[in-house]
């Protein structure tokens, strides 16, 4: 059963969005037009996870036919591949946002999902710690190498 993440009500399978098609399309568009995945909604990722749980239930159910299991396995593999690609593309974008913000000051991250904020904060802290150890100091324009600290940095 798939649930609408906004209303928490069940959605009939035939009425559920084709999340695999949506993710594959997003992935293709991202390759052609970088930045498209900035617009992905958390409900899209949640819908993909809900659909994967549904496929898993079909595969594990003792009453499922072999044909239904085979279809669920194939669909699940495709959906997992698309979801993996989407998540890793998002991680790369978050890393790029963090690097840009340290290089040039504040950068508007665009549409960051709530679950991605923690990752962005952790990456920002790690980058700042590393740059500080390398002799950089924070300025309004981002982290800049300090001449006074260059002499004290050991390699």
Residue ranges of each PLM-predicted region?
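Charge/polar-rich, low-complexity and marginally structured segments
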Residues: 2-150
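Terminal membrane-proximal soluble interaction domains of membrane-associated proteins
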Residues: 151-155
């Amino acid at each position: 059963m798939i649930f609408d993440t906004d209303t928490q009500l069940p959605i009939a399978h035939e009425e559920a969005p084709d999340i695999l098609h949506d993710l594959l399309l997003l992935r293709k568009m991202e390759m052609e037009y970088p930045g498209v995945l900035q617009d992905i909604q958390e409900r899209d990722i949640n819908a993909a996870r809900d659909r994967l749980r549904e496929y898993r239930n079909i595969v594990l159910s003792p009453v499922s036919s072999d044909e239904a299991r085979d279809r669920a396995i194939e669909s699940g593999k495709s959906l997992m591949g698309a979801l993996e690609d989407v998540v890793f593309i998002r991680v790369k974008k978050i890393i790029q946002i963090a690097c840009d913000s340290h290089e040039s000051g504040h950068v508007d991250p665009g549409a960051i999902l709530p679950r991605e904020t923690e990752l962005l904060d952790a990456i920002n802290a790690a980058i700042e710690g590393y740059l500080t150890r390398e002799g950089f100091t924070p300025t309004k324009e981002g982290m800049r190498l300090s001449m006074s600290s260059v002499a004290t940095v050991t390699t």
